[in-house]
Amino acid sequence: MASKTYTLNTGAKIPAVGFGTFANEGAKGETYAAVTKALDVGYRHLDCAWFYHNEDEVGDAVRDFLARRPDVKREDLFICTKVWNHLHEPEDVKWSAKNSCENLKVDYIDLFLVHWPIAAEKNSDRSVKLGPDGKYVINQALTENPEPTWRAMEELVESGLVKAIGVSNWTIPGLKKLLQIAKIKPAVNQIEIHPFLPNEELVAFCFENGILPEAYSPLGSQNQVPSTGERVRDNPTLKAVAERSGYSLAQILLAWGLKRGYVVLPKSSTPSRIESNFNIPELSDEDFEAIQQVAKGRHTRFVNMKDTFGYNVWPEEE
């Protein structure tokens, strides 16, 4: 399963299992060590972002790995990164892509995403502009009309700096608006997906429109469901599926995502987990159906940065 790929609407192949590089602790060297381990294990898809502030460590790990593994070429790797909210002005989109290339020490990016469907203002030093309340100052015009941002994304493809473009955290209404103006359709929509947030309607919409879903937080979250105190990892049905299969709960949840047909992006800084998360079994129909029953009717989102942004992408969930 680890070598499984999907085909993007560009015709490019994308590895179905990617390694998430968001560093929880952010300690210097943590990302370098984790990415090095991931590449050694066999991951060939790295999911990065300008906002993670560790692209330089990812780039160092990639450079050093390729130097000691002449059998692996840059084109064997699939590197994704993302533009942050305050860099949605066309000239900033292009700056962000070039800056990420420099930090990642690559000549091109395989997949470049608009990280959130929210445009924010920036300071003169290209830092995020904050209001008196400490929250982002929203650029309403670019948030409501993403066309200038998307045109800049398309121009990056035309220039060759970026091979494919897509979005992250976009809703069905947002995607519908984008598809109406896009000359180059988004190749992916990276969203939170796990058994407590199966996102059936959005996943189906993406597939119907030739957009490949990618699951971040595919293992759920360390957080509890606010209303019940339940954690994904403590769900008895999910634990039972893992126990009878002989695999870890993480492996089972990743297998569920692959069987649903989308990319999964596990992240870890623990070497043993980095390895086990790459060795994903084929899920039996019985086990798949058991997880589907857990997911049925659930809609618990763990990742919502509304308190940071001062803007809620999902107001209907309030």
UniProtKB/Swiss-Prot annotation:
The alphabetized UniProt keywords are: Glycerol metabolism, NADP, Oxidoreductase
User: According to its UniProt record, which reaction does this protein catalyse?
Assistant: glycerol + NADP(+) = dihydroxyacetone + NADPH + H(+)
**E.C. no:** 1.1.1.156
GO terms in the biological process aspect are: glycerol metabolic process
Q: Quick one: which residues bind NADP(+)?
A: 217-277
Q: Which molecular-function annotation in GO is an example for this chain?
A: glycerol 2-dehydrogenase (NADP+) activity
State the superkingdom. Eukaryota
The family note in this entry says: Belongs to the aldo/keto reductase family.
Q: What is this protein called?
A: Glycerol 2-dehydrogenase (NADP(+))
